[in-house]
């Protein structure tokens, strides 16, 4: 049997059912969510079989959970207002550069996708540098944070911003036409850019 639902609702159900829970597998998006749920003691060790170790790189699994898919959190840009040469060597850290003042959009900081990105920045750059980076990004924002990842892409397409941070699959979803012709047309007005290619690489989750 498969029970689908919102992440928080499913976690609440598993916690309330406790030892009586019939759930064998819990599938959700983002390692941050998995880590938080693991910290509550809700997983059993067992995600370390030979088959899993052979199929999944060590950085995408623990003894308690394993990744089964991955996506990148990248930068989208307007090719009409930003040239490819301007993005050469672009990093997540570059989003705090004053040259992008009034040109960046990203969803709210309470979003788990952003929290995981920030966690990776803390891991690589330290808490102090990451805190300064966050202040720089806020100073560069074209508007107050609002909406989901697709809303950020739409903002770039509409000319409200030049750069947006969003996961890769949202662009594919928009281009497919499943979200309507307006979003499909908007998606064609932006281009994806994978940052940090000269260093640690793009953030994957």
Whereabouts are the PLM-identified features?
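Early extracytoplasmic/lumenal segment of secretory-pathway proteins
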Residues: 1-35
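Beta->alpha turn/N-cap motifs
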Residues: 6-7, 27-32, 49-50, 148-149, ...
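Alpha-to-beta junction loops
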Residues: 17-26, 42, 100-102, 158-166
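A structural signal for short loop-to-beta-strand junctions that line the ligand-binding cleft
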Residues: 21-26, 44-77, 93, 103-106
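Periplasmic solute-binding protein
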Residues: 31-42, 60-87, 119, 202-205
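Short beta-strand->loop
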Residues: 43-50, 61-68, 77-79, 84-85, 93, 98-125, 181-201, ...
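Ligand-binding pocket segment of bilobal, Venus flytrap-like solute-binding proteins
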Residues: 109, 113-116, 120-195
């Amino acid at each position: 049997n498969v029970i689908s639902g919102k992440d928080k609702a499913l976690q609440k159900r598993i916690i309330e059912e406790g030892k009586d829970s019939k759930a064998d597998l819990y599938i959700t998006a983002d390692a941050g969510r998995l880590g938080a749920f693991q910290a509550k003691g809700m997983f059993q060790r067992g995600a370390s079989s030979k088959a899993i170790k052979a199929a999944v790189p060590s950085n995408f699994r623990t003894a308690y959970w394993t990744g089964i898919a991955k996506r990148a959190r990248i930068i989208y840009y307007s090719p009409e207002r930003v040239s490819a040469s301007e993005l050469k060597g672009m990093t997540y850290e570059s989003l705090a550069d004053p040259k992008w003042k009034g040109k960046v959009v990203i969803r709210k900081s309470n979003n788990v996708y952003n929290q995981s990105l920030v966690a990776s920045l803390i891991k690589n750059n330290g808490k102090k540098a990451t805190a300064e980076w966050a202040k720089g990004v806020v100073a560069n924002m074209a508007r107050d944070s609002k909406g989901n990842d697709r809303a950020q892409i739409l903002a770039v397409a509409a000319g409200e911003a030049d750069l947006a941070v969003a996961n890769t699959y949202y662009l594919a979803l928009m281009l497919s036409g499943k979200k309507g012709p307006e979003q499909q047309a908007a998606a064609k007005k932006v281009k994806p850019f994978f940052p940090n290619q000269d260093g640690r690489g793009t953030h994957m989750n």
